[in-house]
Amino acid sequence: MAIRLNPKVRRFLLDKCRQKRYGFLFLGCIFAILYCMGTWPFFAKDIVHDPNNLPYSLQDYSTDKDEPFFRGCTDTKLYLQNPAYSKMNASFVMLTRNEEIEDVLKTMRSIEGHFNKWFKYPYVFLNDDPFTDHFKDQIQAATNATVEFGTVDEIMWEFPAKVRNSLQFKASLEDQNDRGIMYGNMESYHKMCRFYSGIFYKHPLVSKYEWYWRIEPDVDFFCDISYDPFFEMAKHNKKYGFTVLITELYWTVPNLFRTTKSFIKKTAGLKENLGTLWKLFTFNYNILDTDDEEISRWVNFPWDAKPKLTEKLMVDFLLENHGQVNNEEDLEGIQYLVERARSKVPMLEDSLEGEDYNLCHFWSNFEIARVDLFDNEIYNAYFKFLEESGGFWTERWGDAPIHSIGLGMTLDLEDVHYFRDIGYRHSSLQHCPKNALQSQENLNTFDEGYNFGCGCRCVCPKKGEDIEDHSTPCMDIFFELLHGREYEKEFPGCYKPSIKDKDVIEEIRRENFRVIE
């Protein structure tokens, strides 16, 4: 069953106008929005739109590239007894502090009740200070699984001495605070982001495992997880799993993509071997297949092509007639010519080689992944390159966009799994799936089941929005890659133009034959 995509282009464009430093005038953005409303179907005609505008949470997204491992509950007892099943070399990982004990216990009660009471995977707790006996006793009393406590040493946790003792370091944090960057003045937050970006997987308590499941203090799980996510990931050749896909705040990472592109350029063979997951995190401005370099400079979005090529045809027609004005269409040609003379070429300040970071990222507060996704030559070199650039303190680079972009360089879309069936809340963001339509115990206790549902004994919050329906444009892009025409098995490190100028010109000719004949 194909998902019916909901285009949210108008809202997305307004967000881009606010977040990005494009050299477009506001009226230009409004024009693009209005034009897009009328022309989007021409450029996205392969996509099936839902006439009822159903939210994603009421649809089935499954394709041969990704789908829930199970729809609804499986018999956990029989699952564990299956000879084909084997427990994986995996653990939970949490970075926390002694004073967060109550929030840690809240998370543990939730994950134990919904999953680990059956599977008993070990926990690894890390802290930049030693854990107290009180903390350890409370944690060990909350589970029958193995628990390990580790300290993050100074080399792993602290910025190099020459950095943290410099005036520039302190000035950078103060500047971020003055500009209202979220957590920008919190040195500990910068350290945490740096640690999770490229160091946590080297800690001896983590590196001995093949898989990890990152959890945080103060987390709620809303559904039972009646199967082993680690085992199913391995069985289905998945390497990274997520529940939330959202956009980053632009001013926390203004130079992250520029630095990443520099790394790609300096790493032999990397550009030619970028994974197809790269397309989930980047905008493509190489839209139009044309030999006209002047036109290509003006066309950066699908909705740019038709008006710019119409303008070109109008002007060409007028010039061929030596500027004679014989009718209303000729007058339009003159108006186009005047507008072109007055206009400036659109300036995309963050565009690099026709690409830009779209700010989408997997929310790394929840991630289930192979440890060697990060502990490998390419990713380690990437982290080192980022570290040397100083962005972890001159800006407020988060581990989530770094993980995502790093994985985009090496993984294909099929390597990633969306844990849609796992209900999850952390901070103000939450996702909770619809229950599957199947026999469930105590039906009055759990939410109603649906034929498109996949959750197992879910009890979703009555308040709050599901991030799946409101993460624009990230979920739109993800589902389109799973279903739409944009997906390419072979991705030679760069985008191919998706629109041929000849096709657009032919469309214009059919609509406006009097103007150009």
UniProtKB/Swiss-Prot annotation:
Main location: membrane
Segments in the Cytoplasmic topological domain: 1-23
SUPFAM superfamilies reported for this sequence: Nucleotide-diphospho-sugar transferases
The protein's enzyme class: transferase
Keywords linked to the UniProt accession: Glycoprotein, Glycosyltransferase, Membrane, Signal-anchor, Transferase, Transmembrane, Transmembrane helix
Lumenal membrane side: 45-517
Glycosylated residues (UniProt): N89, N144
Transmembrane domains' residue ranges: 24-44
Family annotation (Pfam families): Glyco_transf_15 (PF01793)
Any Gene Ontology biological process: cell wall mannoprotein biosynthetic process
Chain segments carrying region Catalytic: 86-517
UniProt-annotated location(s): Membrane
List of catalytic residues: E367
Family: Belongs to the glycosyltransferase 15 family.
Any further remark recorded for this protein: Present with 2890 molecules/cell in log phase SD medium.
Described purpose of this protein according to its UniProt entry: Possible glycosyltransferase that transfers an alpha-D-mannosyl residue from GDP-mannose into lipid-linked oligosaccharide, forming an alpha-(1->2)-D-mannosyl-D-mannose linkage.
Protein name (record): Probable mannosyltransferase KTR7
The organism of origin for this protein: Saccharomyces cerevisiae (strain ATCC 204508 / S288c)
Gene: KTR7
